């Protein structure tokens, strides 16, 4: 899963995982808050919070088949050789290169596959405005 705008305006699970890692280091020292800890919290931890262990948050037989792939090439990753997970969290991809949700390709080569994105965003804006008008 990914964070929603109710808790983080960016809707970026990567940013939330990175923030968790950095805050753990700030609170408990540089050795605390490893990249693997943050990845575990973001994947299996999120599944546990939702009561969906074994279904989401991992790649295993019987899981729904969600996966995101990031490219770790380019200038941002120039010195990040030893630990790709640490590099991923510290150097920060802007968006996934490929994303598969429930076994279906959603992002290919950094582009959304659906040709309905503009329609979905238009509908989202209308619904968001309706919701926000009730808050006011």
Positions of the model-derived regions?
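Short, solvent-exposed cationic patches
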Residues: 121-136
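Generic structural signal for well-ordered, non-membrane alpha-helical segments
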Residues: 10, 35, 39, 113, ...
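His/Asp/Glu-enriched, well-ordered alpha-helical/loop segment
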Residues: 1-74, 90-91
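Generic recognition of well-ordered alpha-helical segments
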Residues: 16-19, 45, 95, 101-102, ...
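C-terminal cap of metal-dependent C-N hydrolases
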Residues: 64-121
């Amino acid at each position: 899963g990914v964070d929603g705008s109710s808790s983080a305006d960016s809707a970026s699970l990567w940013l939330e995982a990175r923030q968790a890692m950095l805050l753990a280091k700030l609170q408990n020292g540089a050795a605390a808050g490893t990249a693997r800890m943050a990845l575990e919290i973001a994947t299996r931890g999120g599944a546990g919070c939702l009561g969906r262990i074994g279904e989401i948050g991992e790649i295993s037989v019987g899981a729904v088949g969600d996966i995101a792939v990031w490219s770790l090439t380019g200038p941002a990753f120039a010195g990040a050789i030893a630990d790709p997970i640490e590099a991923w969290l510290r150097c920060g991809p802007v968006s996934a290169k490929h994303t598969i949700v429930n076994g279906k390709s959603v992002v290919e080569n950094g582009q959304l596959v659906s040709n309905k994105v503009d329609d979905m965003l238009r509908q989202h804006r209308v619904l968001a405005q309706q919701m926000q008008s009730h808050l006011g």
